[in-house]
Amino acid sequence: MSALVAFVIAGACVPAPSPAPVAVADNAAVKAAFERHADSVEVTASGAVDRLLSDQDGPSGPHERFIVRLPDVAMTVLVEHNLSIAPRVPVVVGEHVDVHGEYVWNAQGGLLHFTHHDPDGSHEGGYIVYAGKRYD
């Protein structure tokens, strides 16, 4: 019996796995992708939520949408976050977010999508960090 108790106590002392690493924000990379009209570029953006938009249905399900202002590169980017894969992020206008995902060019500044884990393992996972919590 005491061996079982020792095993249970030892098992409880095993540290929890570390959360997935968070990439360093690089708004200059977002700006460079915009200037090159690039698509399918993995980037990490950091800025304040500028505007909340209505959810939009797409072929892969409903998407939460909001615009992030990247102050150091004087541009905005649209974030499209798939709600059928990841939880809604309760962002508030003016609050800071870090967003990692795939950049797709458009004339308004581009958009970031794939801001969630990849359930089938065919794409790099993305995430949104807001108020100290990671949403992926």
Report residues per predicted region.
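Short, low-complexity, intrinsically disordered N-terminal peptides in bacterial proteins
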Residues: 1-2, 18
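Bacterial N-terminal signal peptides
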Residues: 2-11
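OB-fold and OB-like single-stranded nucleic-acid-recognition modules
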Residues: 10-136
